[in-house]
């Protein structure tokens, strides 16, 4: 599958809208696009999936490793892959959009805010193209997609100012319908506030989609890793919370779980009973927006009983919050949670951690064997007040974790981390492979 990267000059330049317009242009032209996102984000991919009904691939060399990132890419489907970048093209060094483009050998199309410039837009693009050589990054900046650019003289001025080796791939017109509302943690999820399809189709008309398709190329393939235990998926069942409170799930995680087990979704917000399963996974999301439903629905109480019975439970970020004793919102409302892990969670007005992280296991748990390392990402607005009997699974090699030095609160065969892990990280292998009595 061939593809290209839509990279921005900075955060806030309009990469997500440009990506959605490009995906729309591909569909309108008869292609089946595969969306992807550079970096660890959950929210932008939700907009990709809401638009084209295809899960967006998470491409991050820190989370998955170089080979894991390539495997993640090649598990995609469709005619052509559109990779939305993260922040500005070169921001983030080892985890930058440039690092993803280099690791996959994909051409880069630069999204430049052209609202108040013409020749300066070309100068910006030229500088970004030449900067790759300056820092020794092997990427091709193929051209630009002009964001917030009018037609006529404005578009012509940008096109004419570009050097011959930088292609003008079109523009995204300034339109009030192409704005996505945001909140803490970023934009609203795609299922909540997707852009109007007609507005995207209008924007897509000013993109030279065939020229973009001609620019795309395929990354080098990599051998797949066969990790099945030999048991059929039907032999094991994993209950996975999936609703508006638990919506931060990398597709690679579900793929990893499905490779070894039958995945049984359930909704704690709706008060669903927990499916009969060998393990339970609570991903991140927005439990703070659903405190009353989680407190009264009964699902968390049922999870607490399963945890006390020794069923392995793995919670990430929002999952950690749900497994705690209580959750207090920024409005001061406090809700009882599952009460499995000895912590009280309180939401803060600003983020408490944002970074790629690395953890080293202190002991055997459902997430790792002793001494193993796990890489992931943390981004949260909550803080934990710990009980005196708090026990941790991981020491922090990089990042903040729960208390600045540790992550992974444990009790029974349950673990709750602020760290989000990719399906290629190895974090879910032990959850699937080891019976609870052996942990």
UniProtKB/Swiss-Prot annotation:
<keyword id="KW-0067">ATP-binding</keyword>
<protein>
    <recommendedName>
        <fullName>Cobyrinate a,c-diamide synthase</fullName>
        <ecNumber>6.3.5.11</ecNumber>
    </recommendedName>
</protein>
<dbReference type="GO" id="GO:0042242">
    <property type="term" value="F:cobyrinic acid a,c-diamide synthase activity"/>
</dbReference>
<dbReference type="Pfam" id="PF01656">
    <property type="entry name" value="CbiA"/>
</dbReference>
<dbReference type="Pfam" id="PF07685">
    <property type="entry name" value="GATase_3"/>
</dbReference>
<keyword id="KW-0436">Ligase</keyword>
<dbReference type="InterPro" id="IPR002586">
    <property type="entry name" value="CobQ/CobB/MinD/ParA_Nub-bd_dom"/>
</dbReference>
<feature type="region of interest" description="Disordered">
    <location>
        <begin position="214"/>
        <end position="235"/>
    </location>
</feature>
<dbReference type="GO" id="GO:0005524">
    <property type="term" value="F:ATP binding"/>
</dbReference>
<feature type="active site" description="Nucleophile">
    <location>
        <position position="317"/>
    </location>
</feature>
<comment type="pathway">
    <text>Cofactor biosynthesis; adenosylcobalamin biosynthesis; cob(II)yrinate a,c-diamide from sirohydrochlorin (anaerobic route): step 10/10.</text>
</comment>
<keyword id="KW-0547">Nucleotide-binding</keyword>
<dbReference type="InterPro" id="IPR011698">
    <property type="entry name" value="GATase_3"/>
</dbReference>
<dbReference type="GO" id="GO:0009236">
    <property type="term" value="P:cobalamin biosynthetic process"/>
</dbReference>
<dbReference type="InterPro" id="IPR029062">
    <property type="entry name" value="Class_I_gatase-like"/>
</dbReference>
<keyword id="KW-0315">Glutamine amidotransferase</keyword>
<feature type="site" description="Increases nucleophilicity of active site Cys">
    <location>
        <position position="420"/>
    </location>
</feature>
<keyword id="KW-0460">Magnesium</keyword>
<comment type="function">
    <text>Catalyzes the ATP-dependent amidation of the two carboxylate groups at positions a and c of cobyrinate, using either L-glutamine or ammonia as the nitrogen source.</text>
</comment>
<comment type="similarity">
    <text>Belongs to the CobB/CbiA family.</text>
</comment>
<dbReference type="InterPro" id="IPR004484">
    <property type="entry name" value="CbiA/CobB_synth"/>
</dbReference>
<feature type="domain" description="GATase cobBQ-type">
    <location>
        <begin position="237"/>
        <end position="428"/>
    </location>
</feature>
<dbReference type="InterPro" id="IPR027417">
    <property type="entry name" value="P-loop_NTPase"/>
</dbReference>
<keyword id="KW-0169">Cobalamin biosynthesis</keyword>
